[in-house]
Amino acid sequence: MAKVPVYNIEGQQIGEIELNDSIFNVPINTHVLHQAVVAHLANRRQGTFAAKTRAEVRGGGRKPWRQKGTGRARQGSIRAPTWRKGGVVFAKKPRDFSIDLPKKVKRLALKCALSSKVKENNLIVLDRWDMNQYKTKEVLRVLKNLGLENQKALIVIPEKNEYLQKSTKNIPEVKTLQVGNLNVFDILKYDKFVILQDAVKKVEEVYA
């Protein structure tokens, strides 16, 4: 089992933690990671857009002028795509973009993403982070102590902490997630992966 340092919010190392190799030390499968990211982005799409074809736009049944003799270009309908307020060629219709990956693939992708953070030395374990007020300045102070100033960081907590979650919303480069909402896209998107010690245990309980 790999050992990584455990820090407090002052940035001081206070111990070490052993990480489960079956989660944090698996071979990186880039194909599986790609599948997971594509599925995540596809599942975020609403697919509620809709436009009308020339057959669906109201009006345009009468020929605007006779075929020959006017000197103008021939036209059959004022709802042709070339006309203002005309129909759309190959109009988009509501559709479901969601991609359902097998559970084994999802789990493997998450393990690969976590393992990549360990191998790149981008995983930081915190012993605890208790907040009892909304204070973005405090979050910035802790991140500075950890050497993460002006860096993209994902903070993973074991359970809901409204003070911490809302305090990080004002920082564009930082996002806070509960273990239950952990996903491959966010793990890969953010350069640094900050996880609380209790959250590590929870991840190992769920995915080991």
Curated annotation (Swiss-Prot):
Pfam families for the chain: Ribosomal_L4
Extent of Basic residues compositional bias: 60-71
GO CC annotations on file: ribonucleoprotein complex; ribosome
Region described as Disordered: 58-77
Highest taxon of the lineage: Bacteria
Signal sequence residues: none
Keyword Nucleotide-binding: no
Record Gene3D superfamilies: 3.40.1370.10
GO MF annotations in UniProt: rRNA binding; structural constituent of ribosome
UniProt keywords, alphabetically: Ribonucleoprotein, Ribosomal protein, RNA-binding, rRNA-binding
GO biological process, one term: translation
SUBUNIT field: Part of the 50S ribosomal subunit.
PANTHER family: 50S RIBOSOMAL PROTEIN L4 (PTHR10746), LARGE RIBOSOMAL SUBUNIT PROTEIN UL4M (PTHR10746:SF6)
Protein function: One of the primary rRNA binding proteins, this protein initially binds near the 5'-end of the 23S rRNA. It is important during the early stages of 50S assembly. It makes multiple contacts with different domains of the 23S rRNA in the assembled 50S subunit and ribosome. Forms part of the polypeptide exit tunnel.
Family: Belongs to the universal ribosomal protein uL4 family.
Protein name: Large ribosomal subunit protein uL4
